[in-house]
Amino acid sequence: MTGPEHGSASTIEILPVIGLPEFRPGDDLSAAVAAAAPWLRDGDVVVVTSKVVSKCEGRLVPAPEDPEQRDRLRRKLIEDEAVRVLARKDRTLITENRLGLVQAAAGVDGSNVGRSELALLPVDPDASAATLRAGLRERLGVTVAVVITDTMGRAWRNGQTDAAVGAAGLAVLRNYAGVRDPYGNELVVTEVAVADEIAAAADLVKGKLTATPVAVVRGFGVSDDGSTARQLLRPGANDLFWLGTAEALELGRQQAQLLRRSVRRFSTDPVPGDLVEAAVAEALTAPAPHHTRPTRFVWLQTPAIRARLLDRMKDKWRSDLTSDGLPADAIERRVARGQILYDAPEVVIPMLVPDGAHSYPDAARTDAEHTMFTVAVGAAVQALLVALAVRGLGSCWIGSTIFAADLVRDELDLPVDWEPLGAIAIGYADEPSGLRDPVPAADLLILK
């Protein structure tokens, strides 16, 4: 291959730093490490557990020893430290904190501290790493890299591992894009989190119960490009796992209704038939009276049939408007609005079918029964529009067939009691659009 390799292809040592004190707020971490590891050399990587940095920087919070009270405070601190909750599992919260770190409990930790304390992460771990690096250079005359670590879980895999939350003096990432492997294959997306690999390796020496919060990785070819651990964080817009599964499903449910927009310009991309069929199947679960199925969707799949129907409807609409006395230019503008049904990749006509409707001897109840069935079909239409939207398909409901019911039945050879309730243009939107804003209820929600 060509280009620098992050691996050493030689022996790497991981050395414990023995004899460090129990750190307390105000302690000089660089002085303690220099005293315990005077053997540090240029090019070493000093790997430090974030907990001792937190202790030295006074990031300890007094806590009650009563387990319930301690847990209550811990949860309050998590709430304070987190900027958002990604996922919940029983009592465990996966959060993003102000640093952009995604981990359990926003880094609030009660391990390896006194029972009357809880620890928070350092305010700026990258700055802490730079300070420690400068202090070791001043005291020992060596140029080292520093990695500050914390324990994190991983998506897809059980168990935790240490990762870098602060870094100074090394390239935290190695991007292999464009580099060729020994077989001549170009690497496309490979980017190695070098600082995280160092953090995980050092944890094999530091452990969790060894009272060894600092280790030194020796023999690794360090290159300093000025990057810090912040470069390891993937911003939310680029994160494929921005939410936990349950939370993503919940957000999807909340946004489903707002995805529906009236789309009037479609791309030429074909619409997969199975998506339309699946959306119709969901739409038919809409509420209906008397356990009936009053909705039918007529899918105009044959281009000639669609064109013939729309041409006849256009002629009728133009004739009606002429009878109304509208000027020719106004008529053509009104008629042109129906062009969407010609242009849309797919068109579906919702129908009211009175199967199962109750018969009454009086007009009032007969009209009410018809209204009830009309509402049911309207619910199915809205359900279809939403079902299409959640599948990435745009749609627009057009009322035109209501004004030409006899014509529609005749052209499509449908029973005389089937009532067209508009037409639905379907396709992929020509331009993407975001969620609709909810309409303020205000005067539209009447309270009695």
From Swiss-Prot:
The keyword Manganese applies. One of its GO terms (molecular function) is oxidoreductase activity, acting on the CH-CH group of donors, with a flavin as acceptor. Residues 245-448 are annotated as: Dehydro-coenzyme F420-0 reductase. FMN binds at R260, R261, S262, V263, R264, A288, G399, R436. Binds 2 divalent metal cations per subunit. The ions could be magnesium and/or manganese. Monovalent cation. The ion could be potassium. Gene3D superfamilies: CofE-like, CofE-like domain, NADH Oxidase. Optimum pH is 8.5. Residues 1-244 are annotated as: Coenzyme F420:L-glutamate ligase. A divalent metal cation 2 binds at T151. InterPro entries: F420-0_g-glutamyl_ligase, F420-0_gamma-glut_ligase-dom, F420_FbiB_C, FbiB, Nitroreductase, Nitroreductase-like. Disulfide bonds: none annotated. Coenzyme F420-(gamma-Glu)n binds at D320. Its EC number is 6.3.2.31, 6.3.2.34, 1.3.8.17. One of its GO terms (biological process) is coenzyme gamma-F420-2 biosynthetic process. In the N-terminal section; belongs to the CofE family. This is Bifunctional F420 biosynthesis protein FbiB. The gene is fbiB.
